[in-house]
UniProtKB/Swiss-Prot annotation:
Expressed in roots, leaves, stems and flowers. It is found in: Membrane. One of its GO terms (molecular function) is phospholipid binding. It comes from the Eukaryota. It is a peripheral membrane protein. GO terms for biological process: cellular homeostasis; defense response; negative regulation of defense response; response to cold; response to heat; response to salicylic acid; response to temperature stimulus; response to wounding. Keywords: Membrane, Plant defense. GO terms for cellular component: membrane. This is BON1-associated protein 1. InterPro entries: C2_dom, C2_domain_sf, C2_SRC2/BAP. Coiled coil: none annotated. Residues 1-119 form the C2 domain. Induction: Down-regulated by high temperature. Up-regulated by salicylic acid, AgNO(3), chitin, cycloheximide, ozone, syringolin, salt stress and upon pathogen or nematode infection. It comes from Arabidopsis thaliana (Mouse-ear cress).
Amino acid sequence: MIYFGRSIDNHYTTMMTKTLEIDLRSAEGLKLNRRPIKKKTFAVVKIDEKCRKSNLDESRRSNPTWNYKSEMPINGNEQFIFIEVFYRTGSGHDKKIGEAKIPTNDFMGRYSPEGHLNFLSYRLRDEFGDKCGIVNLSILVKSDPTRDYGACSSQAAVTGLWRPRLETASIDGYGGRTVTGVPVWGLYQRQF
């Protein structure tokens, strides 16, 4: 397939897959028809065709807490993930309160490095586009330990001579403490 003069194949898109650790923390000010919700609520994360459902908050408040962690794969071509919040009726049916549309470049962009924990809050909107609350979550883009070692010998990786380092280095002379160095070469330079 040709797209803007470049060929895109399946191998390219599978290399862009990352793993997200999503923590659905809570919601604030949930409203239905401009009235605070006093029902059991839960949230759903949707990425492409995949979805994960949080536990049900039994408190029956308009500020529910879920603290639900989940890991989900995301293709590098995805532009948005969706968070939907539902309430459960007395008869056991689930009704949608609202949804938040989260751009992936908010946590996978060039200013947000891999391995950085992002705490995010987004406005929930109902089916008419009206504000119906805020959802709070955290997203961590898991880093691939083998990604940075692409420049090392591919032969070493194939033969099993290379393994990613799992422990942190310890320095015997400093008792494991962090040492900070400040360059001072500019202070003592001679003027010629």
